[in-house]
From Swiss-Prot:
SUPFAM superfamilies for the chain: YggX-like
GO cellular component: cytosol
HAMAP family recorded: Fe_traffic_YggX (MF_00686)
Protein name: Probable Fe(2+)-trafficking protein
Cited Pfam families: Iron_traffic (PF04362)
Family recorded in the similarity comment: Belongs to the Fe(2+)-trafficking protein family.
GO terms of biological process kind: cellular response to oxidative stress
Keywords: Iron
Organism domain of life: Bacteria
């Protein structure tokens, strides 16, 4: 049976994550309140931030920045950084 959550990002009930995606209290909060669909959206945004800002994930400051952005993406009203000069692909 699929685990359902009231997703804070989508504002509706949706399929929940299968496991806690990050350790700690933030990971628990995400597991309990974020859907698979919203998590996939974060992964796309995170990839854009890493690539456009040329973040080195071996750098503790870069990892801390991404954790802060993740919390803001889900629980900060969507108030997250956008990569400077990023232009979404045209279809």
């Amino acid at each position: 049976m699929t685990r359902m959550v009231n997703c804070v990002k989508l504002g509706r009930e949706a399929e929940g994550l299968a496991f806690q995606p990050v350790p700690g209290d933030l990971g628990k909060k995400i597991f309990e309140n974020v859907s698979k669909e919203a998590w996939a959206g974060w992964q796309r945004h995170q990839t854009m931030l890493i690539n456009e800002n040329r973040l080195n994930l071996a750098d503790p400051q870069a990892r801390s920045y991404l954790m802060e952005q993740m919390e803001r993406y889900f629980f900060g009203g969507g108030n997250v950084d956008a990569a400077a000069g990023y232009v979404p692909p045209t279809r």
